[in-house]
């Protein structure tokens, strides 16, 4: 809970500062990149959370990974976090920043699940389907062979399930219902 509160405050401050200085989109791209690096490298997360590793070593690691590749505001945040011994929450801050950025910009996350990677045309069609529910959408693509075919779209608490497995389950339920009623 404490990490969530800390992440919220740092992310909010960074969003406000970046927006005030006209670099919000650049900092958003940086935070998405940082989030991706931390998601892909569990050893990096472990090092950042390890209290035995010195703060200057953690700063050197972050500098080597992101120095010269991210905006000055982003690098300043990373430096501040190591000085304040908050480097353990870098991943949480980047995730929270992404959430707050999407909220500020009116972007909704739409999760699309298919059995194989989707094409650009399909991506455009999915965005068009969801355009009536949100003006800006960000597609998160997932592969799940258990749905057998078709797709499942999820946004907030809404779901459009056009998968083969869902249709088979509907047929099975109707058949079972008819057998019971017979």
UniProtKB/Swiss-Prot annotation:
InterPro entries xrefs: ATP_synth_OSCP/delta_N_sf (IPR026015), ATPase_OSCP/dsu (IPR000711)
Stored NCBIfam families: ATP_synt_delta (TIGR01145)
Gene: atpH
Protein name (database record): ATP synthase subunit delta
Keyword Transport: yes
UniProt keyword list: ATP synthesis, Cell inner membrane, Cell membrane, CF(1), Hydrogen ion transport, Ion transport, Membrane, Transport
Similarity field: Belongs to the ATPase delta chain family.
Family matches, as Pfam families: OSCP
Organism this protein belongs to: Cytophaga hutchinsonii (strain ATCC 33406 / DSM 1761 / CIP 103989 / NBRC 15051 / NCIMB 9469 / D465)
Topology versus the membrane: Peripheral membrane protein
Function noted in UniProt: F(1)F(0) ATP synthase produces ATP from ADP in the presence of a proton or sodium gradient. F-type ATPases consist of two structural domains, F(1) containing the extramembraneous catalytic core and F(0) containing the membrane proton channel, linked together by a central stalk and a peripheral stalk. During catalysis, ATP synthesis in the catalytic domain of F(1) is coupled via a rotary mechanism of the central stalk subunits to proton translocation. This protein is part of the stalk that links CF(0) to CF(1). It either transmits conformational changes from CF(0) to CF(1) or is implicated in proton conduction.
Subcellular localization(s) per the UniProt record: Cell inner membrane
UniProt GO molecular function: proton-transporting ATP synthase activity, rotational mechanism
Quaternary structure note: F-type ATPases have 2 components, F(1) - the catalytic core - and F(0) - the membrane proton channel. F(1) has five subunits: alpha(3), beta(3), gamma(1), delta(1), epsilon(1). F(0) has three main subunits: a(1), b(2) and c(10-14). The alpha and beta chains form an alternating ring which encloses part of the gamma chain. F(1) is attached to F(0) by a central stalk formed by the gamma and epsilon chains, while a peripheral stalk is formed by the delta and b chains.
GO cellular component, one term: proton-transporting ATP synthase complex
UniProt keyword Protein transport, yes or no: no
């Amino acid at each position: 809970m404490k990490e969530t509160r800390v992440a919220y405050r740092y992310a909010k401050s960074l969003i406000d500062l970046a927006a005030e200085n006209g670099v919000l989109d650049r900092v958003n791209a940086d935070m998405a990149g940082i989030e991706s690096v931390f998601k892909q490298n569990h050893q990096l997360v472990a090092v950042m959370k390890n209290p035995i590793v010195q703060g200057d070593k953690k700063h050197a690691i972050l500098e080597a990974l992101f120095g010269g590749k991210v905006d000055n505001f982003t690098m300043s945040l990373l430096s501040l976090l190591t000085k304040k011994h908050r480097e353990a929450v870098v991943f949480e801050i980047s995730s929270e920043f992404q959430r707050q950025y999407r909220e500020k910009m009116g972007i909704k996350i739409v999760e699309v699940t298919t059995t194989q990677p989707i094409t650009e045309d399909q991506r455009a069609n999915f965005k068009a389907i969801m355009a009536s529910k949100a003006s800006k959408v960000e597609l998160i693509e997932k592969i799940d062979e258990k749905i057998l075919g078709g797709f499942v779209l999820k946004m907030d608490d809404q779901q459009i399930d056009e998968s083969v497995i869902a249709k088979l389950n509907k047929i099975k339920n109707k058949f079972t219902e008819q057998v019971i009623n017979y």
